[in-house]
Amino acid sequence: DGAADAQLFAAQFGAPMSVYGGIIECSKPINAGPHTYVLRSALRSLDSWIRTGVPPASMPKLQNTADIMGYETDANGVALGGIRTPYVDVPLAVLSGYGQDGGSGFCGLFGTTLTFSAEQLDALYPTADDFLTKWNEATDAAVASGAILEIDAEAIKAAATQYEAMRSAS
């Protein structure tokens, strides 16, 4: 029914700071990037490779900084390179593997979500239609690259239609 996809999308507007019913408490909101879609595509590609011998499409590496201790980012703080999905290419937040400097010992595994301000979102997406156009184009590009499956693309696009309501609620 798409409810889970809508919850994943909504998490970018208010990512949780705890997981597993509060067993693990972190100092900052955890990375709300839905890795499920990329994982499903990777597993499908792995299965196909085993069955046919045809390797999956290769994905670009994250772009390291000169000292190789971090990653190059765009003007919004989003990492350059790596597997691209609409959650990365049409960001509502900076989804990062870094950033937990406190909380439970496992928090370092969860990364962080830094939600954009209303002003940042307005500059990136002047209208909801502008956001949806960019989101749908990025979703189609992710399918074309093999990063996500076509069946997941439908749900990802449907969840994004809630952008305006979620923006208003945040």
PLM segments and residue spans:
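C-terminal His-loop and adjacent cap/lid subdomain of alpha/beta-hydrolase
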Residues: 1-170
